[in-house]
């Protein structure tokens, strides 16, 4: 019997939209059950070869947005990458969809925080969710990025129904 162990910092963001850190082979049976169509990978490094093989075997499209190579790793994720990720997230044709970075904390948390802003969540709730996944490693620059993020920069036509329910 296969064990179904979720990846580090796994969470459901919305219907058929998930978040986590980069999985390892113990997590693959769990991910298979999600029947993912696409994965947004936000880490600066390439995903592990094991994970790339899994994605290929499962016929999942891996979208590696990464980070600017010349950017300081302590800085928040770039606005350009967040907007690119949100455009993918807001296209229902990409579902079921999974967002991840190395540990599922900062880059993933920033993208999800900006998504919550599009959903018109209040900042207190957005930061509570960000902190729940970041734990003791909260980065105030990420929270500031989310707070100042201009949602008007994100254009979409046929967004998932849950976007309008908040």
Swiss-Prot record:
Record EC number: 3.1.3.48
Active-site residues from the entry: 101
Keywords noted in UniProt: Cytoplasm, Hydrolase, Protein phosphatase
Keyword RNA-binding: no
Principal subcellular localization: cytoplasm
Annotated Pfam families: Y_phosphatase2 (PF03162)
Coiled coil spans: none
Domain Tyrosine-protein phosphatase residue range list: 9-162
GO molecular function, one term: phosphatase activity
Subcellular location: Cytoplasm
An annotated GO cellular component: cytoplasm
Catalytic reaction list: O-phospho-L-tyrosyl-[protein] + H2O = L-tyrosyl-[protein] + phosphate
InterPro entries assigned to the protein according to its UniProt record, in alphabetical order: PFA-DSPs, Prot-tyrosine_phosphatase-like, Siw14-like, TYR_PHOSPHATASE_DUAL_dom
Family assignment from sequence similarity: Belongs to the protein-tyrosine phosphatase family.
Record's protein name: Probable tyrosine-protein phosphatase DG1060
Lineage summary: Eukaryota, Amoebozoa, Evosea, Eumycetozoa, Dictyostelia
Name of the coding gene: DG1060
């Amino acid at each position: 019997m296969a064990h179904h162990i979720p990846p580090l910092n796994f969470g459901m963001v919305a219907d058929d939209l998930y978040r986590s850190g980069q999985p390892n082979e113990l997590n693959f049976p769990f991910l298979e059950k999600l029947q993912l169509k696409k994965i947004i990978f936000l880490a600066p490094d390439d995903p592990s070869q094991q994970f790339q093989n899994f994605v290929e075997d499962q016929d999942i499209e891996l979208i590696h947005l990464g980070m600017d190579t010349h950017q300081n790793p302590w800085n928040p994720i770039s606005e350009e990458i967040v907007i690119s990720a949100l455009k993918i997230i807001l296209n229902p044709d990409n579902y079921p969809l999974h967002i991840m970075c190395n540990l599922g904390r900062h880059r993933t948390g920033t993208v999800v925080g900006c998504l919550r802003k599009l959903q018109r969540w209040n900042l207190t709730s957005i930061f509570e969710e960000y902190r729940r996944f970041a734990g003791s490693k909260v980065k105030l620059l990420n929270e500031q990025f989310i707070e100042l993020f201009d949602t008007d920069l994100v254009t979409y036509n046929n967004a998932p129904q849950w976007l309008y329910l908040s």
